[in-house]
């Protein structure tokens, strides 16, 4: 594992890339190569530092607050913001809603938010901006990240850095690749923030929040900062205000993605992809080191198996990605470059990013198409902490193995593969109840990770590698791809139940939910019919197997909405994506019928319902296969 900082574009990063390439070549796989591209990344200005200060009523600086110049939020807006301070807990939608209901305005204020709460830095800053804030400060609270240095905690003077682009890839080429010689149109991602953002330490946060006056916050918002009463602001008791200035610069950087592959015997044009982020702004033991080590070990293992006689039906592709700390830039740009063909070629993607943060609880952030594959694997692999017990048996003791499966999230290395490209993807991670506090800090070192794990880093990494290896082996070997093609019917069924509750109200507005029910039924029947056909076929006949696998591989892709622009709305997946076309947006809009009927927009809802249903019906039609087998009646209004 690497031991030093390896940011993209640095000499250290280039040296590490050369070492990974050398390791791949030593394995003598069928193909090893590098793909390079220029992308626009953001770094702190070399001579002009970002700053934070307290100013008096005339705007003069009364106190300069010390910051670490290497702490920054990539893709923050540059410039200054001055105003009162509002404490917004984790910066979740419900937190900003509470402030609004309490009569606390964040307009023109600098919002202070805690790391965590299931919300990325990018989402926090976006929500603060949407609420009218002029700036954002994000800090690690001792309630969320342990800060007792005697128990492997985060130093109270250490900030956590993370990018704030609400998206992935190069934000100046949204939806299309940054490959060399591309003629860039003058466009940028709508996910770039318009307000400055800075990471601050718990010590700095305590200095600001301890001086606030204003309404008390809810008990659930209480932090563990010393000498801080839980009030939300926006006024300082001294009458002062805060001024923040961000001086980052956009820089074109050469990124290098490194590939190595083993060709399949029967279907070499279908491949299973394994990838890990290589770069990191800090030492990155968890962020990139562990994943890269597991990637190399899996490549070595499968290469040795092939040399010893194993012949995979499908190809295996091992990838070391660059630009991960800036929003999975290298991986996303590669996806954008091959978008038109990936759903025809890529069977599944496994992300090894942040694979080991503990050794107790396994989480699988995944497309539901891979659930059966995971279920079989956890029954085979021993738990890293509980010798003699499989991961499955231990999970059953602790409340059920179903808890392992979790939805994909925006900052995941797997997210873009599914939400943008329509490829089933999974990111696996071992954690423990006490959060690993050092991710995205200069303290994320191998020695600290080993100490947190009690010296079991090797054992835990091996367990995770075996899990991925078991799943990849089945995908590479089985005649029929073991993907659960009916998995999305359950998600739509839950929404159908919500629609049914509002059926009378919808029909009074001239909207019929029957079309969604019909499309869901068609999809379920198509999946069942395809499964029966597979069960009754001779799967050893290569033509038959190929015919069915081609349809199975495209199921995820069918859930990408064809009715939104990939440039304006890159995450087109109607279940996992982001935007007005998604099932979650439709459900939130539907909920307004009960919570706030005046905000329900009938015209917008009609459009959302039609687009979602057309996507679902299209997936059903594609699974059915032949046009003479499809019988549709399209009616969604009276």
Spans of features found by a protein language model:
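Soluble metallo-hydrolase cores and metallopeptidase-like ectodomains found primarily
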Residues: 67-98, 174-286, 300, 304-308
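His/Asp/Glu-rich mid-to-C-terminal helical/loop segments that flank catalytic regions of hydrolases
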Residues: 317, 434-493, 594-636
């Amino acid at each position: 594992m690497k031991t030093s900082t390896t940011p993209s574009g640095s000499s250290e990063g280039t040296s590490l890339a050369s070492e990974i390439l050398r390791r791949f070549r030593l394995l003598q796989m069928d193909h090893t190569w590098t793909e390079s591209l220029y992308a626009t990344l953001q770094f702190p200005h070399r001579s002009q530092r970002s700053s934070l200060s307290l100013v008096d009523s005339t705007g003069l600086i009364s106190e300069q607050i010390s910051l670490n110049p290497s702490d920054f939020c990539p893709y923050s807006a540059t410039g200054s913001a001055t105003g009162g301070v509002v404490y917004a807990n984790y910066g979740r939608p419900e937190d900003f809603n509470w402030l609004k209901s309490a009569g606390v305005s964040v307009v023109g204020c600098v919002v202070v938010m805690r790391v965590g709460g299931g919300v990325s830095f990018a989402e926090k800053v976006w929500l603060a901006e949407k609420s009218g804030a002029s700036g954002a400060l994000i800090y690690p609270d001792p309630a969320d990240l342990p800060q007792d240095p005697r128990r492997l905690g985060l130093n109270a003077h250490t900030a956590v850095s993370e990018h704030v682009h609400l998206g992935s890839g190069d934000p100046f080429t949204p939806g299309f690749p940054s490959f060399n010689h591309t003629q860039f149109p003058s466009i940028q991602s709508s996910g770039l923030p318009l307000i400055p953002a800075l990471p601050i330490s718990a010590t700095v946060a305590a200095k600001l929040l301890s001086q606030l006056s204003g309404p008390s916050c809810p008990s659930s918002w209480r932090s563990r900062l010393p000498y801080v009463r839980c009030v939300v602001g926006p006024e300082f008791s001294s009458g002062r205000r805060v001024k923040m200035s961000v001086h980052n610069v956009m820089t074109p950087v050469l990124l290098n993605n490194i590939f190595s592959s083993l060709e399949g015997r029967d279907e070499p044009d279908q491949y299973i992809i394994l990838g890990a982020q290589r770069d990191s702004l800090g030492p990155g033991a968890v962020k990139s080191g562990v994943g890269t080590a597991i990637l190399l070990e899996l490549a070595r293992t499968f290469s040795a198996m092939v040399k010893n006689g194993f012949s995979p039906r499908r190809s295996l592709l091992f990838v070391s990605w660059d630009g991960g700390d800036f929003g999975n830039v290298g991986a996303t740009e590669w996806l954008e470059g091959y978008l038109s063909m990936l759903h025809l070629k890529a069977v599944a993607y496994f992300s090894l990013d942040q694979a080991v943060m503990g050794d107790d609880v396994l989480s699988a952030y995944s497309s539901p198409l891979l659930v059966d594959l995971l279920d079989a694997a956890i029954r085979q692999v021993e738990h890293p902490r509980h010798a003699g017990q499989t991961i499955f048996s231990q999970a059953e003791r602790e409340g059920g193995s179903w808890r392992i499966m979790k939805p994909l999230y925006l900052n995941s290395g797997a997210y873009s593969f599914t939400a943008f490209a329509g490829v089933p993807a999974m990111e696996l991670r071992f954690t423990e109840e006490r959060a690993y506090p050092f991710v995205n800090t200069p303290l994320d070192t191998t020695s600290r990770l080993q100490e947190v794990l009690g010296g079991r880093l090797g054992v835990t990494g091996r367990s995770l590698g075996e899990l991925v290896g078991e799943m990849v082996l089945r995908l590479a070997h089985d005649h029929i791809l073991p993907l659960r093609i009916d998995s999305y019917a359950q998600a739509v069924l839950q929404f159908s139940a919500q629609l049914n509750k509002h059926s009378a109200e919808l029909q009074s507005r001239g909207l019929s939910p029957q079309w969604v029910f019909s499309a869901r039924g068609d999809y379920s029947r198509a999946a069942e019919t395809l499964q029966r056909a597979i069960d009754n076929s001779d799967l050893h006949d290569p033509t038959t197997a190929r015919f069915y696998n081609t349809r199975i591989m495209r199921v995820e892709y069918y859930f990408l909405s064809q009715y939104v622009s990939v440039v304006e709305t890159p995450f087109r997946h109607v279940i996992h994506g982001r935007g007005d076309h998604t099932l979650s947006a439709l459900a939130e809009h539907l909920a307004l019928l009960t919570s706030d009927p005046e905000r329900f927009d009938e015209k917008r809802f009609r459009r959302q319902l039609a687009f979602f249903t057309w996507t679902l019906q299209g997936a059903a039609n594609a699974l059915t296969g032949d046009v003479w087998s499809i019988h549709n009646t399209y009616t969604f209004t009276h």
